[in-house]
Amino acid sequence: MVLEILARVIKVQLPAYLKRLPVPDSIAGFIRLTVSEWLRLLPFLGVLALLGYLAIRPFLPKKKQQKDSLINLKIQKENPKVVNEIDIEDLRIAKVAYCRCWRSKTFPVCDGSHNKHNELTGDNVGPLILKKKEV
């Protein structure tokens, strides 16, 4: 059933569609096409453009991977790593470090990913450490 439909589209409908297209005999004939004729040509030209792009895409230059950008642009730039430690009385666990570089695989908990980021970019971002306040 599916192959019959596909065969009908390829053998009957596609040739009939191509015969009805208003393709001019010369390049100058494209200037004389009306708006409705251009609209009838648009799907065909779109498919041709897509096929052309897919044909040349393997030969196009690859995009360069963008270098990591700095996260901390101005806070405590004189320190090698910005780490803030906050004492909280109601904290259930003794100490927890939260990520501020957005690169942690265990986000929101810090896993030390900022160290590699800092090496690559020269940044000084570090975690936010919450510590249980000793009463």
Curated annotation (Swiss-Prot):
Query: Which of the residues are on side Lumenal?
Result: 1-37
Transmembrane residue ranges: 38-60
List, in alphabetical order, the Gene Ontology terms for molecular function in this entry.
Answer: 2 iron, 2 sulfur cluster binding; metal ion binding; protein homodimerization activity
Per the record, ranges on the Cytoplasmic side are 61-135
| Residues that, per the record, bind [2Fe-2S] cluster | 99, 101, 110, 114
Any Pfam family: zf-CDGSH
| Required cofactor names | [2Fe-2S] cluster
Which superkingdom does the taxonomy of this entry point to?
Eukaryota
Where does the UniProt entry say this protein principally localizes? endoplasmic reticulum
Q: Which residues form the signal peptide?
A: none
Sorted alphabetically, the Gene Ontology cellular component annotations on this record are: endoplasmic reticulum membrane; mitochondrial outer membrane
Q: How does it sit in the membrane?
A: Single-pass membrane protein
Tell me the GO BP annotations in alphabetical order. Answer: autophagy of mitochondrion; regulation of autophagy
| Cofactor: record remark | Binds 1 [2Fe-2S] cluster.
Q: Which family does it belong to?
A: Belongs to the CISD protein family. CISD2 subfamily.
The entry's function note states: Regulator of autophagy that contributes to antagonize becn1-mediated cellular autophagy at the endoplasmic reticulum. Participates in the interaction of bcl2 with becn1 and is required for bcl2-mediated depression of endoplasmic reticulum Ca(2+) stores during autophagy.
Q: Whom does it interact with, and what assembly results? A: Homodimer.
Q: What is this protein called?
A: CDGSH iron-sulfur domain-containing protein 2
Which species expresses this protein natively? Aquarana catesbeiana (American bullfrog)
Q: Taxonomic lineage per UniProt?
A: Eukaryota, Metazoa, Chordata, Craniata, Vertebrata
